[in-house]
């Protein structure tokens, strides 16, 4: 404990009410956030002669100040604790790294409803189904639904401005409600109802209704219609046969935990209406000497209480670990949801099977992560040996991408001891250079990246320059001219030139722009990590360049038309669903866009056609 912090004097002022406490180090940084039913009793436990763990000893040794916030109830304290953890990201708390909102399938409340993926606050009128573990699961489900139930998935701006059906109608993936006369209101509403039932887990009702309609069509000698409905029945059956469905039809989140070598994996199964919508593995940041019980309790609290605005709470949460605050957590979640939420740790039947599945997935994911981490460590150790460095904790790599010198983008990717650190990847739009001058582009991005103050922990051990001797010379010149407070001589600048025919394993490495380079054996672990970070940088640069090129492509042809400024250009693209939709539109359709007169519509039409 810090000599400046008087624990006895502080504890005399602390109340015995519930609340939250924040501990600060000498630099004024919050290093730990906790809650307590009795603040005085809880805080006194930190200053006993025999502390519970090495982690607590290390924490107490750094305490310079403690702030206390009193709350009315223990539930309020729990909510406030997790809000503070999210805000301060204290180093001694278990931290949930991923706090993104989860995607849902959205069925709009329009006259002709559409299906779409939705993330974030649920302001739009309609129905939301989910949550799904990631965007891929939603897109896969939407593609499947489109094959079985052909209701529209287009944006309203496209739907409102069509005079003829699109390709989705031609291939049987949409009933074409945008064009009058293609589908009756009753038929479209029936397909929407099938989607609603299907996403609610009521597959049997969908099949019963479809079979009844098929039999009616057959009796009325409408054999083509009966055959179409038969195909739809078969499609529904194919999908439902592949799913493991619980007989209960409940909404559950099932949480399994694995813990090994100081790393934890928490695996969450999302079950809605008895169907497994998917699952996701999380690897929370765990301070050294942390007990598994703290990992589980903190993760569960952060997972539900920090993201409650964006996350639909299930009726029941299954855990394979006993929580000391289980009742408090259940009460807090019930209060947030406005309904009863159960937290169960000893389920039976199907629920026990789900829990076993989550536990197995957590163990498998953790084993894979540890193996991957071990491989990265081995490769970085090998690289440090090759480069004659004590260690390599952080690497950064740069690449340049452009098309014939236009829309130049530079990328910087970062690797740490665990591999790619994607949260710190950056793209830089390069301007003010001669088109196609890669050397000037590299010079600019390095100055922008390193010509400023950098935290000591962010100074790379190795900076990899993709491009060989010329680009390495630019990097050397930039670093020689840098006037910065951090140690600019710490990073090792390493150039890498692609091999003949750009084949992997034939790269040449350079420490200096002059003289001969050297190569590593194709099976060298050091070469593998160089190839990995270089490929990541290349892909990241190309991705940014493509986005920039697409943006220019979508706007450049409109920018040449007199009378079309940024606002009108944006309105045209929005209402027509992009430049291609605008090219295919008639004068009358263009004139329907707000702010576009008949005369301007004709000018736009002829400009795009010629």
UniProtKB/Swiss-Prot annotation:
Domain of life: Bacteria
Localization annotation: Cytoplasm
One Pfam family of this chain: UvrC_RNaseH
Domain called GIY-YIG: residue spans: 16-94
GO biological process per UniProt: nucleotide-excision repair; SOS response
GO annotation, cellular component aspect: cytoplasm; excinuclease repair complex
Domain UVR: 204-239
GO molecular function: DNA binding; excinuclease ABC activity
Keywords: Cytoplasm, DNA damage, DNA excision, DNA repair, Excision nuclease, SOS response
Coarse class of the protein's main subcellular location: cytoplasm
Quaternary structure annotation from Swiss-Prot or TrEMBL: Interacts with UvrB in an incision complex.
Function comment: The UvrABC repair system catalyzes the recognition and processing of DNA lesions. UvrC both incises the 5' and 3' sides of the lesion. The N-terminal half is responsible for the 3' incision and the C-terminal half is responsible for the 5' incision.
Protein family membership: Belongs to the UvrC family.
Protein's name according to its UniProt entry: UvrABC system protein C
Record organism: Escherichia coli O1:K1 / APEC
Phylogenetic classification of the source organism: Bacteria, Pseudomonadati, Pseudomonadota, Gammaproteobacteria, Enterobacterales
């Amino acid at each position: 404990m810090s000599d400046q912090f008087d624990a006895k004097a502080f504890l005399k002022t602390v109340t015995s009410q519930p609340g939250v406490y924040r501990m600060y180090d000498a630099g004024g940084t919050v290093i730990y956030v906790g809650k307590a039913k009795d603040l005085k009793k809880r805080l006194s436990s930190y200053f006993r002669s025999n502390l519970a763990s090495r982690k607590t000893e290390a924490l107490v040794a750094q305490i310079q100040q403690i702030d206390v916030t009193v709350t009315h109830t223990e539930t309020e304290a729990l909510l406030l604790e997790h809000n503070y953890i999210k805000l301060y990201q204290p180093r001694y708390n278990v931290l949930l790294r991923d706090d993104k909102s989860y995607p849902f399938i959205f069925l709009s409340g329009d006259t002709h409803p559409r299906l779409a993926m939705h993330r974030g606050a649920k302001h739009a009128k309609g129905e939301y189904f989910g949550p799904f573990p990631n965007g891929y699961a939603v897109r896969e489900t939407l593609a499947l639904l489109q094959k079985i139930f052909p209701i529209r998935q287009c944006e309203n701006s496209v739907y409102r401005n069509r005079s003829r059906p699109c390709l989705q109608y031609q291939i049987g993936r949409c009933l074409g409600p945008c064009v009058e006369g293609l589908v009756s209101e009753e038929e479209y509403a029936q397909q929407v109802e099938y989607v609603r039932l299907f996403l609610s887990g009521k597959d049997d009702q969908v099949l019963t209704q479809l079979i009844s309609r098929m039999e009616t069509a057959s009796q009325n000698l409408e054999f083509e219609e009966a055959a179409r409905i038969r195909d739809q029945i078969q499609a529904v059956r194919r999908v439902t046969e592949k799913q493991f469905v619980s007989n209960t039809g409940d909404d559950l989140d099932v949480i399994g935990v694995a813990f090994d070598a100081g790393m934890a994996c928490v695996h969450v199964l999302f079950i809605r209406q008895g169907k497994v919508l998917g699952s996701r593995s999380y690897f929370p940041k765990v301070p050294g000497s942390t007990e598994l019980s703290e990992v589980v309790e903190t993760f569960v609290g952060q997972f539900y209480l920090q993201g409650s605005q964006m996350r639909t709470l299930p009726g029941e949460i299954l855990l394979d670990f006993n929580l000391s605050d289980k009742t408090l957590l259940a009460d807090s979640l019930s209060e947030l949801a406005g309904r009863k939420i159960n937290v169960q740790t000893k389920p039976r039947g199907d629920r026990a099977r789900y829990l076993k599945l989550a536990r197995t997935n957590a163990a498998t994911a953790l084993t894979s992560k540890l193996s991957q981490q071990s491989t990265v460590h081995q490769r970085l150790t090998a690289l440090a040996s090759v480069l004659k460095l004590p260690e390599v904790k952080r690497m950064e790599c740069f690449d340049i991408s452009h098309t014939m010198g236009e829309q130049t983008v530079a990328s910087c990717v970062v690797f740490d001891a665990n591999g790619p650190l994607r949260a710190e990847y950056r793209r830089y739009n390069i301007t003010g250079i001669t088109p196609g001058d890669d050397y000037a582009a590299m010079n600019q991005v390095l100055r922008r990246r390193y010509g400023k103050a950098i935290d000591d922990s962010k100074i790379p051990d190795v900076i990899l320059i993709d491009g060989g001797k010329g680009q390495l010379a630019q990097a050397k010149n930039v670093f020689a001219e840098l006037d910065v407070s951090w140690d600019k001589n710490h990073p090792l600048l390493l150039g890498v030139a692609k091999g003949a025919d750009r084949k992997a394993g034939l790269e040449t490495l350079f420490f200096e722009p002059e003289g001969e380079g050297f190569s590593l054996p194709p099976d060298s672990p050091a070469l593998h990590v160089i190839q990995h970070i270089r490929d990541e940088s290349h892909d990241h640069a190309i991705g940014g360049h493509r986005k920039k090129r697409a943006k220019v492509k979508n706007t450049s042809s409109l920018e040449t038309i007199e009378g079309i400024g940024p606002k009108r250009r944006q309105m045209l693209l929005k209402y027509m669903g992009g430049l291609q939709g605008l090219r295919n539109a008639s004068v009358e359709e263009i004139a329907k866009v707000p702010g576009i007169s008949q005369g301007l519509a004709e000018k736009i039409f002829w400009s795009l056609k010629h």
